[in-house]
């Protein structure tokens, strides 16, 4: 969409630095009102969320339109993508901004939309500012399998206490003035620091069994699907282990992000100790803006957080954790080397079997006049289509011959359109040596490829 579609003054160009990997950080001085529970008797509000690719997706009504937002504690301002539709939802566009994304590419343009109304059941935020990315090809939706309109973070965390239950997929938003913290002997309460509208926590790690414990300061990033990101050499002891491989980590506004994926011996969160977590080491160039807070050593994402029921308590600068049934699950990763994305819809012919009952005039040899008749018919339905967006060099899929832009037809004998995207991705995270059988379409020809999942780290 051309910038001219938005009617905003061009008097002022502001340089902003944004860091995005399903998480965003913008440094701005403008203020907008946070969320409040309406109704004097309302001490909390419960909502359900979708948990897709290790990310929380919540429905928010924006100016009477229902939109899907990723809940991202690493976001200092609310961001909306897909500018070609934004002007049908938002209004009052002002000022053009330059956003610098994670990666090595160039900044992208955005505009601010003011005085918007946000509503989540009994949670209301008025006069909210929204930043609209003027780049339609930045498409989170294709990587999530559902439409994602934006990301929201500090604006919803700042004035409420959130309890996130990853097992039940529910969030409870508490009114801080009416919240009473219960005694929980199985919980761990950890202090957090809010710096530039983002939460940081002091943790500890061991790179290997023989190394010493290293104290680290980490961003708490509910919008990061990985377990741990570490900034290489942010501490002289933080170096990539010998056993690693280069992996696709995500897409920022400024391009694709890769890192060195490995494992460390353990991560300590107070009294909780997580063993053998996966970790991605990022270099200085791709994380230049993220390192502006020079005390930061990296971030913990949902790969860690989902193992707990988590209380985010910004008003009291604390985080409370209670381990859940996911705590002891093995830390796995995509062992196929494939990045699969949603690629629109296709029309599929499906066989429908119906039965009709009746009573005939002439009885059968047993004197029975009743009958059941099978009626076959065909229905045409739109189903999701998936394609291969990237293949890691040297991975099992690469060695087997899978190529970028191949269309995914079948997985292990089942039509790909019967899966949701996150279900396909989860297949590649399962046990080592699992056989993966793919039917692909390439240049209008069907090809069959198979390979075994291989654990490198």
Predicted features and spans:
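Bacterial Sec-dependent N-terminal signal peptides
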Residues: 1-35
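Pepsin/retropepsin-fold aspartyl endopeptidases
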Residues: 28-457
């Amino acid at each position: 969409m051309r910038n001219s579609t938005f009617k905003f003054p061009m008097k002022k160009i502001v340089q902003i630095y944004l860091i995005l990997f399903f998480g965003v950080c913008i440094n701005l001085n403008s203020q907008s009102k946070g969320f409040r529970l309406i109704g004097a008797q309302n001490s909390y509000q419960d909502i359900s969320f979708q948990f897709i690719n290790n990310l929380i997706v919540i429905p928010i009504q924006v100016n009477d339109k229902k939109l899907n937002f990723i809940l991202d504690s690493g976001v200092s301002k609310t961001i909306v993508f897909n500018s070609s539709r934004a002007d049908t939802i938002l209004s009052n566009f002002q000022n053009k901004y330059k956003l610098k994304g994670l990666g090595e590419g160039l900044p992208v343009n955005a505009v601010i939309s003011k005085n918007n109304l946000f509503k989540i059941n009994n949670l209301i935020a008025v006069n909210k500012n929204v930043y609209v990315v003027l780049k339609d090809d930045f498409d989170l939706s294709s990587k999530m399998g559902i439409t994602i309109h934006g990301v929201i973070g500090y604006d919803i965390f700042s004035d409420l206490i959130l309890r996130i239950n990853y097992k039940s997929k529910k969030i409870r938003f508490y009114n801080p003035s009416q919240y009473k913290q219960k005694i929980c002997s199985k919980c761990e309460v950890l202090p957090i620091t809010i710096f530039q509208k983002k939460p940081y926590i002091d943790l500890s790690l061991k790179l290997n069994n023989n190394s010493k414990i290293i104290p680290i300061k980490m961003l708490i990033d509910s919008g990061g699907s990985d377990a741990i990101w570490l900034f290489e050499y942010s501490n002289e002891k933080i170096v990539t282990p010998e056993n690693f491989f280069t992996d696709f980590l995500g897409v920022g506004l400024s391009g694709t992000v890769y890192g060195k994926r490995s494992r460390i011996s353990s991560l300590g969160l107070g009294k909780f100790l997580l063993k053998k977590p996966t970790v991605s080491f990022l270099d200085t160039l791709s994380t230049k803006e993220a390192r502006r807070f020079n005390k930061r050593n990296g971030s913990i994402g949902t790969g860690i957080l989902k193992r707990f029921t988590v209380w985010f308590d910004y008003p009291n600068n604390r985080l409370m954790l209670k381990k859940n049934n996911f705590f002891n699950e093995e830390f796995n990763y995509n062992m196929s080397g494939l990045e699969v994305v949603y690629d629109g819809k296709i029309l599929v012919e499906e066989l429908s079997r119906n039965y009709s009952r009746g009573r005939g005039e002439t009885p059968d040899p047993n004197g029975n006049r009743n009958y059941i008749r099978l009626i076959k018919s065909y229905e045409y339905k739109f189903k999701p289509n998936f394609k291969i967006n990237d293949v890691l060099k040297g991975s099992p899929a690469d060695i087997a011959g899978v190529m970028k832009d191949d269309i995914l037809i079948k997985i292990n004998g089942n039509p790909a359109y019967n899966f949701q995207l996150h279900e396909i991705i989860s297949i590649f995270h399962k046990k080592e040596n699992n056989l993966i059988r793919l039917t692909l379409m390439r240049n209008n020809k069907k090809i069959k490829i198979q390979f075994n999942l291989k654990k490198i780290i």
